[in-house]
Curated annotation (Swiss-Prot):
Main location: cytoplasm
Self-association state and partner proteins as the record states: Interacts with PKM. Interacts with WWP2. Interacts with UBE2I and ZSCAN10. Interacts with PCGF1. Interacts with ESRRB; recruits ESRRB near the POU5F1-SOX2 element in the NANOG proximal promoter; the interaction is DNA independent. Interacts with ZNF322. Interacts with MAPK8 and MAPK9; the interaction allows MAPK8 and MAPK9 to phosphorylate POU5F1 on Ser-355. Interacts (when phosphorylated on Ser-355) with FBXW8. Interacts with FBXW4. Interacts with SOX2 and SOX15; binds synergistically with either SOX2 or SOX15 to DNA. Interacts with DDX56.
Domain topic, free-text comment: The POU-specific domain mediates interaction with PKM.
Residue ranges of DNA binding: 230-289
Placement of covalent cross-link Glycyl lysine isopeptide (Lys-Gly) (interchain with G-Cter in SUMO): 123
Lineage: Eukaryota, Metazoa, Chordata, Craniata, Vertebrata
Record protein name field: POU domain, class 5, transcription factor 1
PANTHER family registered for this protein in UniProt: POU DOMAIN, POU DOMAIN, CLASS 5, TRANSCRIPTION FACTOR 1-RELATED
Listed CDD domains: homeodomain
Record localization: Cytoplasm; Nucleus
Length: 360
């Protein structure tokens, strides 16, 4: 304790004992414990003497003054788990008006919160949470209507023989916007957001009406399906044309737009087909070159088990082998560093005992 006090304060006690005599305290020396007991926050009331060593003695940072927190509403109290017992003499006084506005201390002795939550934010949260009862009833009614319509849509679709993809394509024919099969599936399963469900419901309602009244809707849907299938058809290139493209690629891997147009005219292909073919061919070349480089690196590094198998004899002693095989027992291992010629361990034969003989 004395060493700690000497390190924290630039005061040194006199060599002698206490008193007013020659062994008493010298002029300008102050007892650290007395000095600590009189210290208080700037602008605040001092703490009476005789309380004991302050927080600096125990190696704990002092509490900040009350005005450093939220407008003087904070309370500086002892922290939990530091080994200090709260004392009545260490409490700071607060005005009665600020005591109600401050943070209440926990009953279990935990440290209080530094500042209070603004009342305006709490009011805004309450206003968000508290909804108008009429609006909540309207939302619930709309949700029930959406659930009933989703069931009706699914029943109508299955009855007429439409798939979810057919419904999406038919919406594209009728309203100019194609919806995916996933969107229709999520609508029927009520997995879309409330806003998207409300937007999609009028379109699906018109689809139900058209499906009931228009008998040609199925044919329209089939025609649209064929058109979409044609759009997704893969382009096939003849072997002769592919060979010509390969030769041109070796000469110029990245042709310009004018060169692509000239190649398309010569080979009788579309410009987009030629352009896409060159793009795909460049990507294929990059992949093959990277694979070849990795293979070369692997061959240059060599196998981790270079060199031939090296035979090491087992420990001396009898080794029981399989009956009928009288060859010496050796363990074949692969050495990471091959032995030079003439330095390999010569195989040492070990006497092997065969099957035990039964004597009469």
């Amino acid at each position: 304790m004395a060493g700690h006090l000497a390190s924290d304060f630039a005061f040194s006690p006199p060599p002698g004992g206490g008193g007013d005599g020659p062994g008493g305290p010298e002029t300008g020396w102050v007892d650290p414990r007395t000095w600590l007991s009189f210290q208080g926050p700037p602008g605040g009331p001092g703490i009476g003497p005789g309380v004991g060593p302050g927080s600096e003695v125990w190696g704990i940072p002092p509490c900040p003054p009350p005005y450093e927190f939220c407008g003087g509403m904070a309370y500086c109290g002892p922290q939990v788990g530091v080994g200090l017992v709260p004392q009545g003499g260490l409490e700071t006084s607060q005005p009665e008006g600020e005591a109600g506005a401050g943070v209440e201390s926990n009953s279990d002795g935990a440290s209080p919160e530094p500042c209070t939550v603004p009342t305006g934010a709490v009011k805004l949260e309450k206003e968000k949470l508290e909804q108008n009862p009429e609006e909540s009833q309207d939302i619930k009614a709309l949700q029930k209507e959406l659930e009933q319509f989703a069931k009706l849509l699914k029943q109508k679709r299955i009855t007429l023989g439409y798939t979810q993809a057919d419904v999406g394509l038919t919406l594209g024919v009728l309203f100019g916007k194609v919806f995916s099969q996933t969107t229709i599936c999520r609508f029927e399963a009520l997995q879309l957001s409330f806003k998207n469900m409300c937007k999609l419901r009028p379109l699906l309602q018109k689809w139900v009406e058209e499906a009931d009244n228009n008998e040609n809707l199925q044919e329209i849907c089939k025609a649209e399906t064929l058109v979409q299938a044609r759009k997704r058809k893969r382009t096939s290139i003849e072997n002769r044309v592919r060979g010509s493209l390969e030769n041109l690629f070796l000469q110029c891997p990245k042709p310009t737009l004018q060169q692509i147009s000239h190649i398309a005219q010569q080979l009788g292909l579309e410009k987009d087909v030629v352009r896409v073919w060159f793009c795909n061919r460049r990507q294929k070349g990059k992949r093959s070159s990277s694979d070849y480089a990795q293979r070369e690196d692997f061959e240059a590094a060599g196998s981790p088990f270079s060199g031939g198998p090296v035979s090491f004899p087992l420990a001396p002693g009898p080794h029981f082998g399989t009956p009928g095989y009288g060859s010496p027992h050796f363990t074949a291992l692969y050495s990471s560093v091959p032995f030079p010629e003439g330095e390999a361990f010569p195989p040492v034969p070990v006497t092997t005992l065969g099957s035990p003989m039964h004597s009469n």
